[in-house]
């Protein structure tokens, strides 16, 4: 039983939630959509709320760092993927991060990038939908109160930054589309379609070194000197960036890429079913990369097919997929940017490791993702 008296993996009834809403996200209609589509359903489900509007970048991060979390049964994030990124990193920056990250989270889509909400919609067995239909589905998930544990990606950069990702890290084509389509934010998710066509017209390649720890080699060795962290979980599979990757890692021989994508969930957008191979096992992420040499026509076909998750059926020799638990990416020429959960970062060496079943989210079922033997882990502690 959790402290609120409800069974493990279920929010209590009645329920108290703090709603963090970005009124400028996506098409700028989040507050209007909350009043029209979310609030009536919450009232019927006996979910009381306090609404807080974010005013600037990292405002939500600052709020959750100091918020008295015991007042709430869950934190509801209504915006795009970037606001959930802020909230999770704010929780992990608290002195009580180990308990703070157990506070259940809920994603209500109202941004231009709604990949996390689309993934949860998919896991619940709903049809792929967008806009108000996706918002309604995710609100219904909140009303049903079921929780599921989620993987968390820990990242370290060459400049010494340590951060956490709830969705993805992209480099190359996808990150450039994120950056260059920012000016079309008012189009909602259509900005990414427009950005894709514009970037295809001037296709770039990016030079770098990619290495990863595949699922099958996790049990073989553990680094003698894992990377040192001041706060947060220990990344036992990572060594300092100035050292070579461990010998049991795979180093990709190619050094010219169109894109690299580490993805924790099924969707990269509400209409981008990027990982049709199924939900990641506990402690695993999807790693995709596209090698240089792919034609514009093939890349366009892949992105169009991704809407229905059929891009892997092309068996494109330039598109590589592997399930991994850790990776390292070292850009060589300074070109391009990183996009972490849709938030842009400078291009520099970065490495990351997945932590299994690390936090709770409102989902369609209480079942954790499938486990695989070498790193089978229990769900996180009971939600607070």
From Swiss-Prot:
- Cofactor requirement: Mg(2+)
Q: Which residues carry this modification: Phosphoserine?
A: 225
**Locus of motif Nuclear export signal 2:** 161-169
Per UniProt, substrate binds at: 79-82, 178
Q: Which GO terms describe its cellular component?
A: cilium; clathrin-coated pit; cytoplasm; cytosol; early endosome membrane; endocytic vesicle; intracellular membrane-bounded organelle; membrane
**Primary localization:** cytoplasm
Could you tell me the keywords of this UniProt record? ATP-binding, Calmodulin-binding, Cell membrane, Coated pit, Cytoplasm, Endosome, Kinase, Lipid metabolism, Membrane, Nucleotide-binding, Nucleus, Phosphoprotein, Synapse, Transferase
**A Pfam family assignment:** DAGK_cat
Query: Outcome of residue 82 to D?
Result: Loss of enzyme activity
Claim: Lipid metabolism is one of the keywords in the record? yes
GO terms (molecular function) for this protein are: acetyltransferase activity; ATP binding; calmodulin binding; D-erythro-sphingosine kinase activity; DNA binding; lipid binding; lipid kinase activity; magnesium ion binding
Annotated residues for binding of ATP: 22-24, 54-58, 86, 111-113, 185, 191, 341-343
Q: What is this protein called?
A: Sphingosine kinase 1
* Protein's organism: Homo sapiens
């Amino acid at each position: 039983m959790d402290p609120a008296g409800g069974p493990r993996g279920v929010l209590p009834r009645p329920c108290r939630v703090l709603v963090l809403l970005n009124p400028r996200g996506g098409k700028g209609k989040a507050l209007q959509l909350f009043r029209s589509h979310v609030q009536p359903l919450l009232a019927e489900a006996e979910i009381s709320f306090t609404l807080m509007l974010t005013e600037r970048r990292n405002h939500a991060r600052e709020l959750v760092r100091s918020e008295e979390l015991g007042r709430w049964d869950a934190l509801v994030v209504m915006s795009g993927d970037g606001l959930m990124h802020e909230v999770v990193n704010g929780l992990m920056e608290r002195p009580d991060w180990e308990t703070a990250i157990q506070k259940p989270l809920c994603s209500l889509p109202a941004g231009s990038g709604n990949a996390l909400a689309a993934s949860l919609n998919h896991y619940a067995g709903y049809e792929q939908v967008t806009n108000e239909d996706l918002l309604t589905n995710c609100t219904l998930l909140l009303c049903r109160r079921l929780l599921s544990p989620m993987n968390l990606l820990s990242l370290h950069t060459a400049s010494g930054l340590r951060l956490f990702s709830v969705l993805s890290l992209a480099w190359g084509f996808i990150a450039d589309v994120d950056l260059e389509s920012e000016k079309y934010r008012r189009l909602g998710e259509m900005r990414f379609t427009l950005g894709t066509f514009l970037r295809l017209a001037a296709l770039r390649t990016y030079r770098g070194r990619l290495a990863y720890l595949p699922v099958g080699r996790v049990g073989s060795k553990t680094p003698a000197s894992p990377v040192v962290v001041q706060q947060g979980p220990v990344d036992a599979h990572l060594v300092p960036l100035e050292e070579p990757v461990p010998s049991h890692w795979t180093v990709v021989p190619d050094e010219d890429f169109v894109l690299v994508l580490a993805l924790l969930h099924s969707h990269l957008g509400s209409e981008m079913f990027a990982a049709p191979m199924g939900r990641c096992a506990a402690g695993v992420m999807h790693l995709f990369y596209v090698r240089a040499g792919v034609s514009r026509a093939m890349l366009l076909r892949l992105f169009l097919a991704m809407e229905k998750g059929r891009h892997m059926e092309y068996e494109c020799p330039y598109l590589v997929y592997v399930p991994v638990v850790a990776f390292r990416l070292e850009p060589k020429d300074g070109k391009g940017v990183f996009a972490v959960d849709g938030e842009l970062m400078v291009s520099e060496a970065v490495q990351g490791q997945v932590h299994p079943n690390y936090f709770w989210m409102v989902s369609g079922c209480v079942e954790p993702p499938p486990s695989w033997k070498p790193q089978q882990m229990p769900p996180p502690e009971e939600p607070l």
